[in-house]
């Protein structure tokens, strides 16, 4: 029987754990979020994050930008937030707008306030497999937490990651490599015949290509686990990158869309913010 990897239930446990820790911490935990209020998708997603952050006991502060803002305007705002000792975590919701250099924005976030783990500093520590405290990009970290919640054994298995973005695919492949998996990183330019062969050999398949129902392969290992990171709209409905109905009968475990990786990303962001707050408290003593 196929098992659904329920990100909603796992994320609720993470949020409750954070809530309990915040209640005992004795100091406020504040998350600052920057987003473009003219982007409806960003408004909706930020609203979800703020509701869950509030549940977990965090203080949320919104900083709204619009299409008139330039990269330098946002950099000035970030500089103020970096210097504000009351801010524990900073989240920049992409996309910010046309012409905004988002790489420059992410790298301007103080690494000790980088709740999403997207700065070059934190990504560098990930690639180095550093042992000291650092923040892993939230979505890949959420995938790992989801798999761990279902007691997935990583070592000595084959993984296929489809999607090579700096925000997800590349850090995901490194996280799996650091857990002793043999990882193939494929992308939109990988020939379909090659991709089919990679999928056939994989024990774990993680798909983040940004196209609704794109992954439709069915010639898979009988015990394969499929993680769908897609967040698309199709006919008004949230749809993943994996054709769920087609692939479902051919796997042992699969994450749904919605209700899989999305809630895990949000819970991870909130956990990161608390972890950063604890670290900052130690630095101030």
Curated annotation (Swiss-Prot):
Gene Ontology biological process terms, A to Z: L-histidine biosynthetic process; methionine biosynthetic process; purine nucleotide biosynthetic process; tetrahydrofolate interconversion
Cellular component terms per the entry's GO annotation: cytosol
Listed pathway(s): One-carbon metabolism; tetrahydrofolate interconversion
Keywords: Amino-acid biosynthesis, Histidine biosynthesis, Hydrolase, Methionine biosynthesis, Multifunctional enzyme, NADP, One-carbon metabolism, Oxidoreductase, Purine biosynthesis
EC number: 1.5.1.5, 3.5.4.9
GO terms for MF: methenyltetrahydrofolate cyclohydrolase activity; methylenetetrahydrofolate dehydrogenase (NADP+) activity
Catalytic function, reaction form: (6R)-5,10-methylene-5,6,7,8-tetrahydrofolate + NADP(+) = (6R)-5,10-methenyltetrahydrofolate + NADPH; (6R)-5,10-methenyltetrahydrofolate + H2O = (6R)-10-formyltetrahydrofolate + H(+)
One Pfam family hit: THF_DHG_CYH_C
Residues holding NADP(+): 163-165, 188, 231
PROSITE patterns (UniProt xref): THF_DHG_CYH_2
InterPro entries: Aminoacid_DH-like_N_sf, NAD(P)-bd_dom_sf, THF_DH/CycHdrlase, THF_DH/CycHdrlase_cat_dom, THF_DH/CycHdrlase_CS, THF_DH/CycHdrlase_NAD-bd_dom
Subunit record text: Homodimer.
PANTHER family, per database record: C-1-TETRAHYDROFOLATE SYNTHASE, CYTOPLASMIC (PTHR48099:SF5), C-1-TETRAHYDROFOLATE SYNTHASE, CYTOPLASMIC-RELATED (PTHR48099)
Function: Catalyzes the oxidation of 5,10-methylenetetrahydrofolate to 5,10-methenyltetrahydrofolate and then the hydrolysis of 5,10-methenyltetrahydrofolate to 10-formyltetrahydrofolate.
Family: Belongs to the tetrahydrofolate dehydrogenase/cyclohydrolase family.
Protein name: Bifunctional protein FolD
């Amino acid at each position: 029987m196929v098992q659904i990897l329920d990100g909603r239930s796992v994320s609720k446990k993470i949020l409750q754990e954070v809530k309990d820790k915040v209640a005992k911490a004795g100091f406020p935990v504040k998350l600052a979020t920057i987003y473009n209020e003219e982007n409806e998708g960003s408004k909706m997603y930020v609203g979800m994050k703020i509701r869950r952050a509030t549940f977990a006991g965090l203080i949320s502060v919104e900083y709204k930008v619009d299409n008139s803002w330039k990269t330098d305007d946002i950099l000035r705002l970030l500089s103020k937030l970096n210097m504000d000792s009351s801010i524990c975590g900073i989240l920049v919701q992409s996309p910010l707008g046309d012409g905004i250099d988002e790489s420059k924005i992410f790298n301007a976030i103080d690494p000790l306030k980088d709740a999403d783990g997207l700065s070059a500093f934190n990504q560098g520590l990930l690639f180095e497999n550093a042992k000291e405290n650092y923040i892993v990009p939230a979505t890949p970290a959420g995938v790992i937490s989801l798999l761990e919640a279902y007691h997935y054994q990583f070592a000595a298995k084959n993984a296929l990651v489809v999607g090579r973005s700096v925000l997800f695919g590349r850090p995901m492949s490194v996280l799996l490599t650091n857990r002793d998996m043999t990882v193939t990183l494929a992308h939109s330019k990988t020939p379909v015949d090659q991709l089919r062969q990679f999928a056939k050999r994989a024990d774990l398949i993680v798909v983040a290509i940004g196209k609704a129902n794109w992954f439709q392969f069915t010639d898979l290992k009988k015990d394969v686990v499929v993680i769908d990171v897609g967040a698309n709209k199709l006919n008004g409905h949230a749809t993943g990158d994996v054709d769920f109905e087609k692939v479902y009968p051919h796997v042992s475990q699969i994450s749904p869309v919605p209700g899989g990786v999305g809630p895990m990303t949000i819970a991870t962001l909130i956990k990161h913010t608390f972890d950063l707050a604890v670290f900052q408290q130690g630095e101030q003593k």
